[in-house]
Amino acid sequence: MAYNGRDQEYGGHALQDLPAGSSQYHLPPQENDEEQGRGLLNSGYEQDRLGARTPPDRPVSAYSLTESYAPGASSAMPGQGPTGYGDTGGSFGQFGNLDANAPFPRPDSAFDPEDSWVERQQQPQMGGGGGLGRSKTRKIKLVQGSVLSIDYPVPSAIKNAVQPQYRDAESGTEEFHKMRYTAATCDPNDFTLKNGYDLRPRMYNRHTELLIAITYYNEDKVLLARTLHHTMQNIRDIVNLKKSTFWNKGGPAWQKIVVCLVFDGIDKADKNTLDVLATVGVYQDGVIKKDVDGKETVAHIFEYTSQLSVTPNQQLIRPTNEGSQNLPPVQMIFCLKQKNTKKINSHRWLFNAFGRILNPEVCILLDAGTKPSPRSLLALWEGFYNDKDLGGACGEIHAMLGKGGKKLFNPLVAVQNFEYKISNILDKPLESSFGYVSVLPGAFSAYRFRAIMGRPLEQYFHGDHTLSKMLGKKGIDGMNIFKKNMFLAEDRILCFELVAKAGQKWHLSYIKAAKGETDVPEGAAEFISQRRRWLNGSFAATLYSLMHFGRMYKSGHNIIRMFFLHIQLIYTTLNTMFAWFSLGSYWLTTSVIMDLVGKPNATSGVHAWPFGDTGTPIVNALLQYLYLAFVMLQFILALGNRPKGSKFTYIASFMVFGLIQGYILVLSAYLVVRAFDTPIGDQISFASTDAFLNSFFGGSSAGGVILVALITIYGLNFIASFMYLDPWHMFHSFPYYLVLMSTYINILMVYAFNNWHDVSWGTKGSDKAEALPSAHVTKGEKNEVVVEEVEKEQEDIDSQFEQTVRRALAPFKEEEEVEKADVEDGYKSFRTGLVVCWLFGNILLIVCITSTNFDNLGWGEPATERKAHYFQFLLYATAVLSLVRFFGFLWFLGRTGIMCCFSRN
């Protein structure tokens, strides 16, 4: 259907047709996917699919997608051998029944998981003989003489897995029969129709309403499958809509949705994930070309429409009947970048290359590993459909807690879970009410494509270092350190530029119904490294938005929106100021609470608690010194050590600060109890308004202040969580947060600010890409530019696919990463230990000599006498050392004079 992305309507359906805050979509009741119990692969395909012309001496593959290699799969055949991947003794489906008389026995070694990925990319040699060597060659004409774009037949098992109603409806296309590969030898900005590049959805004249992007760095196949499979399930939710004012008009719903996977470099990619994508049909080994006629390939682009999916537990999902639980066809684009050029560059391929050709209305961004909940992507899209001025939105991201919440036993996971929950309950709704959500997380967010086109994307892509030469001083290499840190939180820049876009009134929103799960760091080193980027980036981006707030006046926002944006400006400014002084504030809070509880007052009859009038001041003093010592230790560590190189020191720091904070919480509880020993009526006067205010905020008792603290710090969190109908984090995660909240400042912020200079940019080459085959150009019969390559037989494709599926569906074994400290880490660790010993030794000396807290114990002399005696010791010691030096001088002088008399010429 014809579609103009710049119009204010969806092909004639006004964006405001549906009332805001409600949905008129009627979703069918959805059953839970029983991945392990479903008959996943129980429908075979034609036995004579190889055709009558198959050579009689050619061994025919016994493989079909009716097999399952996962433990407990229902399609396992009886009487199979014990050599399967499964834990229950299952085998490789039909291969388990091959006997000695089978025409094509395959030993286990044929499926060596260590088989080199690079070797599989090499083209088979042309020539005679059996096997792959007898394959024919074909000549591929380059588009406009420079663009290599080839259609490759997909394995028979993939092709035959497509349901007949879809295969027959698209019989005039090669969508389900062939995978399309394009070697992009250009910058993303030059990936245009004018330069000969194109994508299948546009070639088939389809309107793309929803472009779902999954960005990938080096995640394993379980994380990728988790995101891709649940994305396909979300697409099924949309396709199964019964009553819709949009999706059921103008063609099938699945043709309006495109899933785009962008991999950030060949070297960093886990090659097992490529096997998963090959099983789905959107990738094949032996296809990619490292260059075309000597021009380096920048990105390898694969396209295919598939109904297959692989679950996170390595189950293969394919259509089994005509039921609504079958996955619909999903149009996929897989962009494998040759080099690791960072996430911003991946988004440039998404928006500037693919987005400009497909012209989608809404782009949803996901990170590999994020698990969108059912109907979440639909909820995000509905937000845009119901609000024509919505430029961007995000859903609720919560931490993945493991089966039965077992990860909550890890304090770091619990703390992050509470942080995510409170952000979703209090922070995001507040900012959404203002119309400007300061950050839409790149792991789970959505943008209206025409809203971010222009200046928002231009400013956003200034952080792409591949553009640094072209942009000059405006590029990443020409930026000062402040701007470089700003691009560590590049999503915040895009949000601000979108809301401040000149002449427009786009706003941002938080959509509660859209939910996504993501993994969080479970170790101290990973947690610190992640927060270093987040804290520095968010601080710089926040200052950028505050300093450039004046650009809001050039936008098209109405006076009411501008009023609330000014309120948000004041709110953000105050928060930034508190964050700046938080290090000192935490120390002052700690010391004040210790003094309030730990110092006896003879006049009022108040005694020190909990160790008595004698012991409490000493314990408090030691804890205060320990607190300061570990704060100084954080500065020493942060100025030179990697978190992974000082893992145990950081763990000890978390424990020490947690111990001190726990002690402070106990003292605070004691203060509350002591404050309310006196009846509240005696502390706060209700005689008049002035009397109430004076006694509540300025009275000698602490009752009013403590009430305010209890309500704002604890009460509001509980009330909001219960009103949100999600209070459980207040019970299992909030206690951890109370104990470890000081570490957010004393460890995370100290490390972040001390590593403000650490901005990791730069491209990494691809060693594996160097070994890939090239596309050599020749002249054809009509003098056109062509590339000659081997054309594989269908039997060869199917045979290789067997091994691919075996690798993809093999149970995942997580390899424990052994962090090997390099030589420099060893040097830095020694340096740190040396400085710590030197610094703490001097601090200990000062404490022992000058502290008056030891006087009450009767240990030795009072502090004043200790100082005097230490001063005397210094004088005598200095005198003795000086005399020793002088006597040494005399000895040297006399010896030299005597030896001079007896020396020989």
Swiss-Prot record:
The chain crosses the membrane at residues 562-584, 618-638, 653-673, 705-725, 733-753, 832-852, 873-893. Induction: Exhibits lower expression levels in hyphae than in germinating conidia. Exhibits the highest expression levels during colonization of wheat. Disruption phenotype: Leads to lethality. CDD domains: Chitin_synth_C. Pfam families: Chitin_synth_1 (PF01644), Chitin_synth_1N (PF08407). It is found in: Cell membrane. Belongs to the chitin synthase family. Class III subfamily. Polymerizes chitin, a structural polymer of the cell wall and septum, by transferring the sugar moiety of UDP-GlcNAc to the non-reducing end of the growing chitin polymer. Plays essential functions in fungal survival and host infection. This is Chitin synthase 3B. It comes from Gibberella zeae (strain ATCC MYA-4620 / CBS 123657 / FGSC 9075 / NRRL 31084 / PH-1).
